[in-house]
Amino acid sequence: GKDQYARLDKISVALPHPDAAAAIIKGGTEITGHFGNPPFQEQELADNPNARIVLKSYDVQGGPGSATVLYATEKFRTESPRTYTAFVNALADAAEFIAAQPEQAADIYLKLTGAKTSRQLLLSVIRNPEVQFNITPQNTLGLGQFMHEVGAIKNRPQVLADYFFDDPRVASGS
C-alpha cells in the first residue's frame, strides 16, 4: 500500500529478467525473489521446485496489466511519423499474430532468441488467459495515479492521453 510501497527497496537490486530467472532457478544465491514477467516467471516455477508465487500483478492491479510499455518523444513522433506509425503497426501485427497463431509464434520466438525454454512451457504462457498480447494499455492509469500519490512521479495522470499518444488503439485502454 501507499505507506509501505518502498519497504523492500533497500533489499532490492535491478537485474535483467534472464539473469534474475537464472538465479531463482539455480537457487542458493543472494537473489531470493523476482518480480518477473513471462516467460521467465513460468520458467522459475517449472525449474525450481522451491519457487512459489508470492503475489501476481494480475491480482494487485485487478486484471491484466501491460507488461511492457515502449516510449518515444513527441519530437520523434512529429519528425518521423512514418517510422513511428510503422513501428506501432508492426507491434499490433505481432500481437494479433501471437493470438491467432500461438504455435507458430512460439516457434519463431524460440528460433530468434535461441532460448532454451521448452516449447510446451512457452505455449502455456501464450495461451494463459492472464497473459494478453496487445498494444492497448491495461491497468496503467491506476498504477500512474498510485505512483503520483507516493511521490514517484510529479504529475498525476488523469487520462491515458496524459502519457500516451492519441491513437484509436489506445483510447479503449486503462
Feature annotation, model-predicted:
Residues 21-23, 65, 130-133, 166-171:
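Short, solvent-exposed polar/charged micro-motifs at secondary-structure junctions
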Residues 78-154:
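Secondary-structure end/capping motifs
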Residues 1-16, 27-31, 117-119, 153-160:
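A local structural motif
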Residues 57, 123, 160-161:
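Residue-level "edge-of-site" marker
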Residues 1, 44, 139-145, 158:
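Short, polar/charged alpha-helical segment
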Residues 10-13, 18-110:
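Pocket-lining segment of extracytoplasmic ligand-binding domains
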Residues 44, 62-63, 127-128, 164-166:
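Short secondary-structure boundary/hinge segments and terminal tails
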Residues 147-174:
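Conserved C-terminal helix/tail region of periplasmic/extracytoplasmic solute-binding proteins
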